[in-house]
């Protein structure tokens, strides 16, 4: 008998109490999984966000599957509320131990770092897609679909610059799932989102007549050239402030604290709101969602803005622009 999606294992399911049915396969609520699929996608935050499109694609190809996704604790929020994901697991020793004793029909690992590739090799599955760990310690493609991306990543000045596929197209190829313009998705609780917006507008005396520009001025430490210059932002801010209706929100991590403070002080305007380090990742999503236009480099802010369908102005340094699909938003 196939395992029903309502099966608890240690206690009766809800329909046992509702219908009193003991023989599961005779119940009208019996709804078994046909495939068990595991996605490993741990890093980085922005990549986890833009990988969410894959969940929808998998469910289109495998509509009766159980989809489990393991990710870093700080990225879990990006997956919560996604109707295509059945189970979310945080990356820790307990979760790894639990997954080691299970078996999946399909395992998809999108990361090339050792912690992810070693998990892919340690977990049991009938079919492996994406990346595993070679016995000599380097990542290796586990299926034909991953070979193109693997080769591309080893040739930055050749194949990577010539590549015309977006990130979503690449991970769908790795996963052996047809890509049909599926978009990244983040779920925000409607009531929480409204409360955040109302409180923010009240605190800073913003009305719906204002136009809000969110400027995410920094980037992660691995590729520092993803961020625009401070002088460039100062010129932009001064230009935007010429319209009295415009409100500017500065965002960033601790790395941008000094930079944003200097941008703010260069104008001495009360229409600049410096929110650097003020909010959690969840609140940061709420902040992006209340903005009219998001201006950012290739960072997690860009991918959140895409997922929330915000208008975007973006710029690219080391990232090949063709890998980023803005889905008509900028």
Task: Provide a role label for each language-model segment.
Residues 1-330:
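Catalytic machinery of carbohydrate-active enzymes
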């Amino acid at each position: 008998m196939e395992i029903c999606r309502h099966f608890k294992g240690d206690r009766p399911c809800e329909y046992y109490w509702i219908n009193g049915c003991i023989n599961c396969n005779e119940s009208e609520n019996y709804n078994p999984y046909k495939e068990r699929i595991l996605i490993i996608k741990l890093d980085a935050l922005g990549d986890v966000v833009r990988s969410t499109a894959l969940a929808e694609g998998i469910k289109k190809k495998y509509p009766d599957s159980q989809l489990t996704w393991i990710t870093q604790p700080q990225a879990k929020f990006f997956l919560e509320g996604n109707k295509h994901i059945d189970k979310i697991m945080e990356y820790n020793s307990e979760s790894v131990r639990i997954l080691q004793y299970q078996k999946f029909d399909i395992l998809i690992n999108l990361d090339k770092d050792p912690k992810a590739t070693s998990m892919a090799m340690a977990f049991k599955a009938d079919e492996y897609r994406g990346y595993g760990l070679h016995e000599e310690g380097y990542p290796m493609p586990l299926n034909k679909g991953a070979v193109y991306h693997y080769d591309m990543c080893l040739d930055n000045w050749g194949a990577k610059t010539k590549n015309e596929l977006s990130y979503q197209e690449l991970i769908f190829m790795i996963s052996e799932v047809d890509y049909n313009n599926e978009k990244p998705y983040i779920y925000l609780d409607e009531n929480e989102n409204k409360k955040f917006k109302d409180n923010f507008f009240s605190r800073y005396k913003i009305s719906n007549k204002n136009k809000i520009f969110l400027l995410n001025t920094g980037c992660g430490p691995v590729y520092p050239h993803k961020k625009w210059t401070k002088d460039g932002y100062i010129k932009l801010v001064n230009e935007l402030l010429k319209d009295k209706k415009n409100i500017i929100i500065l965002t960033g991590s601790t790395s941008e604290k000094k930079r944003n403070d200097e941008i703010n002080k260069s104008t001495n305007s009360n229409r600049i709101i410096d929110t650097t380090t003020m909010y959690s990742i969840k609140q940061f999503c709420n902040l992006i969602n209340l903005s009219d236009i998001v201006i950012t480099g290739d960072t997690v802010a860009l991918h959140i803005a895409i997922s929330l369908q915000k208008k975007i102005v973006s710029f690219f340094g080391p990232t090949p622009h063709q890998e980023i699909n803005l889905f008509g938003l900028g």
